């Protein structure tokens, strides 16, 4: 268990590495690492919180284990898109997976998520996405991803508070 810092990450901090095509997201949750892990690996829970509130998520394929794959469709009345990837490592404190937006199938990102127990009922989620190019990274950042990340994490806060990830 690590020490809690004085920095406040109750809203997501999204940073681009100037030297690498990397996006880093840091966010603290009033949750245990086990609750966050479950919310990221249980397809029913994942579909309830991921993405912006204006979009619903339908899980098409989900096998959250080393070597497993996933695919989901995000849609609203006037819009539909799909994402897919493979789980490379799934452990209670770390998930490593690929992430591909099917509209750009050649653009594959390698994502690493870690769940750090801060004590006192708080866990820090760190997500790092190594994107295939600086252009791809910058396109992600300008796509409105910040809204989707923050709205999704707010929904995750509610899901955890309701006890759904226990």
For each of these PLM feature ranges, what is it?
Residues 1-8, 131-166:
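A conserved amphipathic terminal alpha-helix motif
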Residues 1-56:
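Hydrophobic ligand-binding cavity/cleft-lining segments
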Residues 20-26, 33, 57, 69, ...:
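Intrinsic-disorder/low-complexity, polar/charged segments enriched in Ser/Thr/Lys/Arg/Asp/Glu/Gln
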Residues 24-25, 44-82, 166:
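Short beta-edge strand/loop motif at the mouth of beta-sheet-based domains
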Residues 22, 96, 100-150:
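Beta-strand/loop substructures that line and gate deep hydrophobic ligand-binding cavities in soluble
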Residues 33-34, 65, 88-93, 115-124:
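A short, structured loop/turn motif at beta-sheet edges
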Residues 36, 40, 46, 70, ...:
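Hydrophobic pocket/interface hotspot
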Residues 26-27, 59-62, 82-88, 99-100, ...:
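Hydrophobic/aromatic beta-strand elements that line small-molecule binding cavities or substrate pockets
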């Amino acid at each position: 268990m690590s020490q809690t810092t004085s920095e406040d990450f109750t809203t997501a901090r999204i940073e681009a590495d100037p030297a690498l095509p990397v996006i880093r997201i840091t966010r603290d949750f009033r949750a245990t690492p086990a609750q966050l892990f479950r919310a990221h690996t249980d397809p029913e829970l994942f579909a309830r919180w991921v993405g912006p509130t204006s979009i619903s998520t339908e899980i098409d394929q989900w096998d959250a284990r080393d070597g497993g794959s996933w695919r989901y469709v995000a849609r609203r009345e006037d819009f539909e898109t799909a994402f897919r990837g493979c789980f490379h490592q799934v452990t209670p404190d770390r998930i490593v997976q690929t992430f591909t937006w099917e509209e750009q199938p050649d653009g594959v990102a390698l994502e690493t998520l870690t769940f750090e127990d801060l004590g006192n009922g708080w866990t820090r989620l760190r997500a790092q996405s190594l994107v295939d190019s600086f252009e791809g990274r910058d396109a992600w950042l300008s796509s409105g991803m910040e809204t989707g990340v923050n709205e999704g994490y707010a929904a995750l806060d509610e899901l955890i508070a309701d006890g759904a990830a226990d």
